[in-house]
């Protein structure tokens, strides 16, 4: 048997700040091999965003194929912790350390659950990357390519992101909004403010374009998604002088969008809007993920039933929050996210309630048993 608390502690002790691995994958691989999994590891990418350590582990054969996906990397701890963020410390019923809830605790809980299953029908796999908190270029995307090439794509996937809010089990994510980042640059001609006829100020046209973008009504949301929103995140001219008309004005924005849109269509909308007010401006865009949803059905129902059995709660099915690697996995199969409470993720003194670790392992065990016993789930 595997103790989820002990395994979480060993993982926290690996300072795997993205994209560093710091031994985390070796800890995971050793635990999985000890309970009969075949483990495949490979690195992808180059500096500065890599190399990234990735792991795929599999046990069993035939269908159904159930996968658990997660990440071993963590965000930088920052300063001001009560204790060393990479020396796991128990204070009362809380285990403190970077990654406790996001998401080394969930990985440990799933491995502990898998250890209890013994011989089972079907196939269980784990898809673990060290590149979720970073650019997400060489992690789950590379793992998906690897699985496709070997015919190892799952039928269902559970992502262990910390979806719970106030109590373990109060929220499950069945979808996520898409995200697109955009950079706008308007070039003028630098000059003295007393001689505007000898210069071309790039700011007024950019301001008009931004005002028009801020006024856009993208949609009203729908049954499962809140309205899409566009946020201007930076406006900059790099001008510290009081008597100089700047040569260039720049802005950056982000759009979080629901399944009423595709990222490319929103990029085109922004380009058209900017062109109307700042014809000389250039627009660059990066779509980090499209929106997706796994409609409520058998998969979310059995997850909800397992949560109810262990916690007594009926979870809310939600699409709120930021992006996750579920956006990539949703292209393979139905995907749902469920994990620990997220109140301290990315914060100083990140901590998980120890009883929640054990309860999460119980929930994961029930989910996997149900899926493997009912191929049509």
UniProtKB/Swiss-Prot annotation:
Amino-acid positions noted as binding Zn(2+) 1 in the UniProt annotation, renumbered to this chain: 71, 102, 161
Enzyme class of the recorded protein, top EC level: hydrolase
Entry EC no(s): 3.5.1.18
UniProt entry keywords in alphabetical sequence: Amino-acid biosynthesis, Cobalt, Diaminopimelate biosynthesis, Hydrolase, Lysine biosynthesis, Metal-binding, Zinc
GO molecular function annotations of the record: acetylornithine deacetylase activity; cobalt ion binding; succinyl-diaminopimelate desuccinylase activity; zinc ion binding
Residues annotated as binding Zn(2+) 2: 102, 133, 346
Domain of life of the organism encoding this protein: Bacteria
Catalysis performed (reactions): N-succinyl-(2S,6S)-2,6-diaminopimelate + H2O = (2S,6S)-2,6-diaminopimelate + succinate
CDD domains for the chain: M20_DapE_proteobac
Gene3D superfamilies cross-referenced by the UniProt entry: Zn peptidases
Cofactors demanded by this protein: Zn(2+); Co(2+)
Classification via Pfam families: M20_dimer, Peptidase_M20
Functional pathway: Amino-acid biosynthesis; L-lysine biosynthesis via DAP pathway; LL-2,6-diaminopimelate from (S)-tetrahydrodipicolinate (succinylase route): step 3/3
Keyword Hydrolase: yes
BP-aspect Gene Ontology terms: diaminopimelate biosynthetic process; L-arginine biosynthetic process; lysine biosynthetic process via diaminopimelate
Catalytic site positions: 73, 132 (proton acceptor)
InterPro entries: ArgE/DapE_CS (IPR001261), Bact_exopeptidase_dim_dom (IPR036264), DapE_proteobac (IPR005941), Peptidase_M20 (IPR002933), Peptidase_M20_dimer (IPR011650), Peptidase_M20A (IPR050072)
Cofactor-binding details, from the entry: Binds 2 Zn(2+) or Co(2+) ions per subunit.
Family in the record: Belongs to the peptidase M20A family. DapE subfamily.
Subunit structure: Homodimer.
Function: Catalyzes the hydrolysis of N-succinyl-L,L-diaminopimelic acid (SDAP), forming succinate and LL-2,6-diaminopimelate (DAP), an intermediate involved in the bacterial biosynthesis of lysine and meso-diaminopimelic acid, an essential component of bacterial cell walls.
Record-given protein name: Succinyl-diaminopimelate desuccinylase
Gene: dapE
């Amino acid at each position: 048997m595997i103790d989820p608390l002990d395994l979480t502690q060993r993982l926290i002790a690996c300072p795997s700040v993205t994209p560093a691995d710091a031994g985390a994958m070796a800890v995971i691989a050793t635990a999985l091999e000890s309970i009969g999994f075949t483990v495949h590891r490979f690195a992808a990418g180059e500096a500065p965003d890599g190399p990234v350590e990735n792991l795929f582990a599999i046990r069993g054969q035939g269908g159904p194929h159930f996968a658990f996906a997660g990440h071993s990397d963590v965000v930088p701890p920052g300063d001001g912790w009560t204790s060393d963020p990479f020396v796991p410390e128990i204070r009362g019923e809380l285990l403190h350390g970077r990654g406790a809830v996001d998401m080394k605790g969930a990985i440990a809980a799933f491995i502990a659950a898998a250890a209890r299953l013994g011989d089972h029908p079907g196939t269980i796999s784990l898809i673990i990357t060290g590149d979720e908190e970073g650019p997400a270029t060489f992690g789950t995307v590379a793992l998906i390519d690897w699985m496709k090439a070997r015919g190892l794509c799952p039928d269902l996937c559970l992502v262990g992101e910390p979806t719970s809010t106030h109590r373990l089990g109060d929220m499950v994510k069945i979808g996520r909004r898409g995200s697109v980042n955009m950079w706008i640059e308007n070039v003028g001609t630098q000059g003295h403010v007393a001689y505007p006829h000898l210069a071309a100020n790039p700011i007024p046209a950019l301001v008009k374009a931004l005002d028009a973008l801020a006024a856009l009504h993208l949609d009203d949301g729908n049954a499962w998604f809140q309205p899409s929103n566009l946020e201007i995140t930076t406006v900059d001219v790099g001008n510290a002088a009081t008597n100089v008309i700047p040569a260039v004005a720049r802005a950056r924005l982000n759009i979080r969008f629901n399944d009423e849109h595709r990222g490319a269509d929103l990029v085109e909308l922004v380009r058209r809007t900017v062109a109307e007010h700042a014809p000389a401006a250039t627009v660059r865009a990066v779509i980090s993920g499209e929106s997706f949803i796994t409609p409520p059905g058998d998969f979310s129902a059995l997850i909800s039933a397992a949560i109810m059995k262990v916690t007594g709660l009926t979870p809310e099915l939600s699409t709120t929050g930021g992006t996750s690697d579920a956006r990539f996995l949703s292209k393979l199969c139905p995907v749902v996210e469920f994990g620990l409470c997220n109140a301290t993720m990315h914060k100083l003194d990140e901590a998980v309630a120890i009883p929640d670790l054990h309860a999460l392992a119980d929930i994961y065990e029930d989910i996997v048993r149900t899926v493997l016993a009912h191929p049509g789930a």
